[in-house]
Amino acid sequence: MLENLPYFQRHLPDDLAKVNAVINQAVQSDVALISQIGTYIISAGGKRLRPIITILAGKAVGHDDEKLYSLAAMVEFIHTSTLLHDDVVDESDLRRGRKTANNLFGNAAAVLVGDFLYTRAFQLMVGSGSMRILEVMADATNIIAEGEVMQLMNIGNTDITEEQYVQVIQYKTAKLFEAAAQVGAILGKASPEHEQALKDYGMYVGTAFQIIDDVLDYSGETEEIGKNVGDDLAEGKPTLPLIYLMRNGSEQAANDVRHALENADRRYFEKIHDYVVNSDALPYSISEAKKAVDKAIASLDVLPDSEVKDAMIQLAKESLARVS
């Protein structure tokens, strides 16, 4: 856990307190239901990884002021808005260990409050006074939406390649990690070389994070991952462990995985889970995540050595610790 690492023990509480202060103020609205739902999902916590990356990227290039924490909150609002929308699309009933907003308040309210958080994020962006930051975030949110549609198109797709899978997760998940790091670098007036390094770092950390998330759907517990295990299979999502089995498993395993994905039924989970854990699907997936982490760390080589750089390396490694 990040809070057990020395740098984060010293700085994380204060940094997150500043971000949460912005979030708690910005989530308020004269429309009571917006404040109620917004506060509900924000107060569920979460790891705040993306805001932390924004803060670290800014500090890595020598920048630390109130605008940095406002941008970090903006990134969290973008993330939270996508969660609200995702839970409606996926018909999820559990998020971060609690009932989803759509489960409690209905789909319409969840979607509309997601829209509110999304537009509030853009108001926070404007406060940065940087057209480049607006440009980066406009591009990122567009690509994230494309990634979500790509994922939707691949529901039940048993012919998906590993390359296509990586493209989907880099669009829908890693792109926001990339943007989170890049806006911190831009605010800190980083050199082009350092901005690119931090941008790459975010992309690779985000890629590793999503692969591990997909691994945990077969190796984690509901209490640990904050959602129902087996959700991906129940939704017909061909994640990396399943793609590996379809390409490298026995004929019986491959056929059963294809059948389970095409029918998107949780009743198949126990059988598919047994195939996954008794094969190399999870070790292979974890090794691919480790490759992404190694690339994230290598991308920081151009930055001068510092306590913040060390913290970013620790954060990248921490994405793998969830399955160790």
Regions found by a protein language model. Give the residues of each.
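All-alpha prenyltransferase/terpene-synthase fold signal
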Residues: 1-324
